[in-house]
Amino acid sequence: MDYYRKYTAAILAILCVCLHDLQSFPDREYTMQGCPECKLKENKLFSMLGDPIYQCAGCCFSQAYPTPARSKKTMLVPKNITSEASCCVAKAFTKVTVKGNVRVENHTECHCSTCYYHKS
């Protein structure tokens, strides 16, 4: 019985070391947890029609925390959880016409800014 405990403890220790090593290399996509950083990514659908079209994609900051009692009193509809977030949006873009008459935005620079779709 003691032999199995030592064996299990050794396996768990090796597993923890391996997981720590994998998380130490954030530049590799297969080891990344969650979402990649905010940056330009080619839109394959619109790029098939000619010149490459880029869009901003990735993650920025977000957090949720309990709403303070003082703030809850001033809310029209009190909520227990308050959240803050910033989204990956285009800092600069150019309007491009593809396939004759379809106008799209070709993003040229990205940054983390206010999430407009969260506003009501």
Swiss-Prot record:
Bridged cysteine pairs (disulfide): C35-C59, C38-C88, C56-C110, C60-C112, C87-C115
Any single GO CC term annotated in Swiss-Prot or TrEMBL for this entry: follicle-stimulating hormone complex
Signal peptide range in chain numbering: 1-24
Biological process per Gene Ontology, one example term: regulation of signaling receptor activity
Glycosylation sites: N80, N106
A Pfam entry, by short name: Hormone_6
Family in the record: Belongs to the glycoprotein hormones subunit alpha family.
UniProt protein name: Glycoprotein hormones alpha chain
